[in-house]
């Protein structure tokens, strides 16, 4: 593992040519102003000073990383990341199940997708803020802040006695959850070379190997039908305990780094906060975080997507002004967001100079489709297995997490293979193709006891495909930019990932709520019975066991709706494969990030892409010359 730190970042600290950032940080050399590039106002000296503070944090991060250049210290770091991943991974594995029981206890099970949409919108808005703040204040402080939000949200959810309060807790919980995952991912990226980056990023996912088998036992013994409140609440102290090792690890890194001469050399450089104080930094952070843009994006997404999940059910309510108003407002906010980002934002959510390159926009497209397709196929898969396949709680929990298990088992072998191949694009394309195969299998096996083996097979294929492209997409785009912009492109990918989950949950929920009740009523013919089956399916199946006419009617209704869900997922696998073809294919090296990028460029465009070259030459092979 010595190759991870074959380059001493401290020796390179005078060579910070971060994607032409010296043109932005130095007003004298910044000839082409933002007015020319974006149609934005000229950046102020104070704002540039805050941007320069980000480079100071990056330099400090590199010195901290060099303090852990021994293999055993790297092993301690990875073990700490594993323990942290175990905490949020196990909680994530079972909390979505408890959410289903919570909504069912409120007789609002169909609002599961509404909560998922709210979660995803909050998550998407949080990603950008976390990434930009981490470059100003450092990774550790943001990580601790995320843990606090996680705990607060967990406590609120555990004490909620209606779906509105549960959703409010979900806002805090998800803001913390995505922050922990993103900052942990950035920390591991800071301390690994591109060649070993995938292995490091896989480490927090490895607990799924254990969690897949114990999650079912936990949920069945916890009796979530009765005790879901305590089952959620106990994570308010379990998860922070799992974060203690990584926090201690980061503190130890800083302690070692502070004793180095390189760190003392940086002491002469004051941060923006040290020079200007709290009030002025708040004013400048308002522009750096693009607070207005983030709020407009979150409000627009929420106003459009949440009504889609609320308008159906026992009674269609599209004629209700309380739904129509927010829905229309969401679309009205889109042009307002565009005008703000183009004319007024100093640091736009989507920085054009980054996003315009295919390395970035194609990876963002894939990130969006990953979660969109996932939620279309799996949003109600657990419920389908319980109600329409007659799985037990333990079995359904294990099967629902099977794709994660397979993906995790394959990940270390694949990551080691990548260190030898040093190319990711062929694997990404093959992984996207496997997802299409998995969606086809889920379409075929969607109800009846005979679907048990088919669903397991589909999720295994899904898991292998997940290994080959979900995390590699992030590493692919990181390998095309400098260290200065690594957190930004990582956050952009994860923001689109969360937006994909929001849209996927909304579309999935819209199909479910608009269709399911009508199908149940059509097959049962009894309004009271159909209403009970729709609103509280877990309670209904305890009364009407497998094989009864009422249960068969409910099973067929679930099969019909799940068919629509998987068709949408299958169709969107086509653009997923198309985006994978558009990726760049940079060679993975022993450096933390791309070190030299031409002035004025934000992405390394001098990569060799054999796959795209082959496709470009393909038409010439079928041309015929006239004799």
UniProtKB/Swiss-Prot annotation:
Write down the InterPro entries for this protein, in alphabetical order. MFS_trans_sf (IPR036259)
Which regions of this chain are Extracellular-facing, per the record's topological domains? Answer: 1-70, 132-135, 189-197, 253-290, 345-367, 420-424, 476-563
Q: Where in the cell is it found?
A: Cell membrane; Endosome membrane
Q: What is this protein called?
A: Siderophore iron transporter ARN1
Mind telling me which SUPFAM superfamilies this protein's record contains? MFS general substrate transporter (SSF103473)
Q: Which residues lie on this side of the membrane: Cytoplasmic?
A: 92-110, 157-167, 219-231, 312-323, 389-398, 446-454, 585-627
What membrane topology term does the record carry?
Answer: Multi-pass membrane protein
Function text: Involved in the transport of siderophore ferrichrome and so has a role in iron homeostasis.
* Species the sequence originates in: Saccharomyces cerevisiae (strain ATCC 204508 / S288c) (Baker's yeast)
Name a GO molecular-function annotation. siderophore-iron transmembrane transporter activity
Q: Transmembrane stretches, by residue range? A: 71-91, 111-131, 136-156, 168-188, 198-218, 232-252, 291-311, 324-344, 368-388, 399-419, 425-445, 455-475, 564-584
Q: Which family does it belong to?
A: Belongs to the major facilitator superfamily.
Keywords assigned by UniProt, alphabetized:
Cell membrane, Endosome, Ion transport, Iron, Iron transport, Membrane, Transmembrane, Transmembrane helix, Transport
Q: What is its main location?
A: membrane
Q: Name one GO cellular component term.
A: cytoplasmic vesicle
Q: Name one GO biological process term.
A: transmembrane transport
